[in-house]
Amino acid sequence: MKTLLLTLVVMTIVCLDLGYSLICFISPHDSVTCAPGENVCFLKSWCDAWCGSRGKKLSFGCAATCPKVNPGIDIECCSTDNCNPHPKLRP
């Protein structure tokens, strides 16, 4: 009986993957460990008045869910470590 209980405890820990936190970029070269409950990395891009000369503005980060899409804003969401790199730094 003790062996069965120990096996169940070990299986529960393995299945729950306790302590895992997602890692996301917050700038082109810096990443952070996301807070508990933040299971998505995102990359937002949009044009401002200088888009033609400077390119799109970018925002990186962690979120609980993929941010809402608004007109003129592109959003990419993903759920693996460092999956939201700067578009020019992608492999």
Curated annotation (Swiss-Prot):
Keyword field: Acetylcholine receptor inhibiting toxin, Disulfide bond, Ion channel impairing toxin, Neurotoxin, Postsynaptic neurotoxin, Secreted, Signal, Toxin
Pfam families: Toxin_cobra-type
One Gene Ontology term, aspect cellular component: extracellular region
Main location: secreted
Tissue: Expressed by the venom gland.
Homology family: Belongs to the three-finger toxin family. Long-chain subfamily. Type II alpha-neurotoxin sub-subfamily.
Protein name: Long neurotoxin OH-37
Lineage of the organism: Eukaryota, Metazoa, Chordata, Craniata, Vertebrata
